[in-house]
Amino acid sequence: MEQFRNIGLLGRMGSVQVVETLKRLKNYLVGEGYAVILEEATAAVLPGHNVQVSSKKMLGEICDLVIVVGGDGSLLGAARALAGCNVPVLGVNRGRLGFLTDITPTEMEPQLAEVLSGKYVEESRFLLDAYVKRNGEPVGYGCGLNDIVLHPGKSTRMIGFDLYIEGQFVNSQRSDGLIVSTPTGSTAYALSAGGPIMHPRLDAIVLVPMFPHTLSSRPIVVDGNSEIKIIIGDYNQTYPHVSCDGQTHVTCAPGDTVTICKKPQKLRLIHPMNHNFYQICRDKLGWSSSRDQGGQ
């Protein structure tokens, strides 16, 4: 297992709980002899920290491990910044669901001690790139660990578009939009729109129509290396948006083309040894268990 010496810390701003957890975490790591590097915005909320400070981009270049304190949204933002750096990322949950951030604050020190001693599970999670072109010229780009979503923005009108997968025409669709999700994102927005849950190790992409006008338009699961092309009808009277993880946005125009494909660089996500995807689904999604009723 990889030896961690230089550890970067990154936290969600605007939360007292996150700041307190960051202080605890920094003091613990320094006390254990690790070199701690704070992301610059994180350092601003920890006055008197007395450790090195770095930009988010450089954090991935100089650290052996980056620990993100916050919710899944915080880790999504970190993933987009760090995926190209080949640095492992670990999440401490200070949000609500915590599908990605699975170190608990109440057991943070013992769980971290296990991870730092080499007892952890590592996963590779792929991201999606989205390229927007207008009259053949690039006008926007974004990437997402969870999903790329075409939606009407502030408009209440449906969007008309043509869908192609690997150059093959799939259908013409009128709907509120389309969610193009990774397995990581299948338990997020795609799930609420009726998409399937995919195991994180699957090399697949799911396309989930949002309130389609044709009821036979159903979610489609395709190979993870597929190129997905959406041609926004030039007859539309609205300017749709392309959102990446719900955090970055590109405004499109009628006639634009959105091309979505797997990002070459992957996120290295690490978990404690007891990480169990199905246990997380039971806990976070309220799945029942016969064990809860005294079954075997």
From Swiss-Prot:
Provide the Gene Ontology terms for cellular component: cytoplasm
The record ties this protein, via InterPro entries, to:
ATP-NAD_kinase_N, ATP-NAD_kinase_PpnK-typ_C, NAD/diacylglycerol_kinase_sf, NADK
According to its UniProt record, which reaction does this protein catalyse? NAD(+) + ATP = ADP + NADP(+) + H(+)
Cofactor(s) this protein requires? a divalent metal cation
Which UniProt keywords are given for this protein, alphabetically ordered?
ATP-binding, Cytoplasm, Kinase, NAD, NADP, Nucleotide-binding, Transferase
Q: What is the disulfide pattern of this chain?
A: none
Q: What is its EC number?
A: 2.7.1.23
User: Among its keywords, does the record have Cell membrane?
Assistant: no
Q: Which residues bind NAD(+)?
A: D72, G73, N146, D147, R157, R174, D176, T187, A188, Y189, A190, L191, S192, Q247
Instruction: Tell me where in or outside the cell this protein is found.
Output: Cytoplasm
The similarity annotation says:
Belongs to the NAD kinase family.
Purpose of the protein: Involved in the regulation of the intracellular balance of NAD and NADP, and is a key enzyme in the biosynthesis of NADP. Catalyzes specifically the phosphorylation on 2'-hydroxyl of the adenosine moiety of NAD to yield NADP.
Q: What is the protein's name according to its record?
A: NAD kinase
Q: Which organism is it from?
A: Hahella chejuensis (strain KCTC 2396)
What gene codes for this chain? Answer: nadK
